Amino acid sequence: MCEHHHAAKHILCSQCDMLVALPRLEHGQKAACPRCGTTLTVAWDAPRQRPTAYALAALFMLLLSNLFPFVNMNVAGVTSEITLLEIPGVLFSEDYASLGTFFLLFVQLVPAFCLITILLLVNRAELPVRLKEQLARVLFQLKTWGMAEIFLAGVLVSFVKLMAYGSIGVGSSFLPWCLFCVLQLRAFQCVDRRWLWDDIAPMPELRQPLKPGVTGIRQGLRSCSCCTAILPADEPVCPRCSTKGYVRRRNSLQWTLALLVTSIMLYLPANILPIMVTDLLGSKMPSTILAGVILLWSEGSYPVAAVIFLASIMVPTLKMIAIAWLCWDAKGHGKRDSERMHLIYEVVEFVGRWSMIDVFVIAVLSALVRMGGLMSIYPAMGALMFALVVIMTMFSAMTFDPRLSWDRQPESEHEES
């Protein structure tokens, strides 16, 4: 049945392109795509107060985390302690400015910027509309790049690695950092993209009938990748957020494969070159990713060895294989099993960033283990190569258009008549 209702009552699924008529949602309810199961929108209770409270609390915890010592270590009576702000400083001093920059961006600056942006937007700060649109656009683009919780996991892994050399303690800022990780995740979770954009600017009018259960491409429609507005397929710029777009991402497979090949080329030196060098009583011992896993396993740290093996070796390898498989299927060589491809894509998107855990482990070890001739740990070129592998695979997954996997799938079972 064709409907002439305002486009605000409908949404195009960003994952499978199905047009869905949104039901009336009570507080706490969510609408999901009947075709692929993707969450389309969530009706949060107190949509302004909740993210505001979480964001303010998270920013306060972030401030406390940077004011006091974070972790400390004692080896043979020699004590070393660091603050969070000292970690990038050490990396810069060791001529690994790129790793220090990654730490500052992904662990500190990106989460802080996103939290401040949430406060400004959900509370309707007196800002020019164009600036609000730009902030909202950047907010959802940067969301994936906030890695505070991954850094926390890296710190815990570092503790296990260092317990064989001395006693490890946490400083006054460790608990605030743990709280910050939880609060900032909750602040992001309580901001619904569709609600936020509707609050910034109204949905553009659409002067053509809408048919729920039919894909947008069959109706001559496309979804704005930024603000979820439903637009005519031939309209290149969204009138609400000014984002350029197309029915399908232009050259999606070409970009995805190019970035995938780049990550594969970087992955080889990342596993061959040392990721860190341990200077113990004047004896320098370079260590690769696999050597670190073997050492942890031989010392009986089986859970940590398994975590590092999964995050640093299995996940990047399987992610690259999965992305190649998605591209192969999107080219029409698969068995039209779109649901399986969609599940693979969701897993790839979720787990890919967690491979940064090994990079953060090296950052913590390099900053904390500074004990002169007794013991010191330095980052090595393999760590930079591995960080670039993770970043390239993340970009590769982002440039892939998941709707390509659904374009060959029949949709008659979802069409309303």
UniProtKB/Swiss-Prot annotation:
Transmembrane segments: 51-71, 102-122, 257-277, 285-305, 347-367, 371-391
Source organism: Escherichia coli (strain K12)
Membrane topology: Multi-pass membrane protein
Induction or repression: By paraquat.
Alphabetic keyword roster: Cell inner membrane, Cell membrane, Membrane, Transmembrane, Transmembrane helix, Transport
GO biological process, one term: response to stress
InterPro entries reported in the protein's UniProt record: PqiA-like, PqiA-like_proteobact, PqiA-PqiB_transport
GO CC list: membrane; plasma membrane
SUBUNIT field: May form a complex composed of PqiA, PqiB and PqiC.
PANTHER family the record matches: INTERMEMBRANE TRANSPORT PROTEIN PQIA, INTERMEMBRANE TRANSPORT PROTEIN PQIB-RELATED
Subcellular localization(s) per the UniProt record: Cell inner membrane
Periplasmic side: 72-101, 278-284, 368-370
Cited function: Component of a transport pathway that contributes to membrane integrity.
Protein name per the record: Intermembrane transport protein PqiA
Family that this chain belongs to: Belongs to the PqiA family.
Side of membrane Cytoplasmic, spans: 1-50, 123-256, 306-346, 392-417
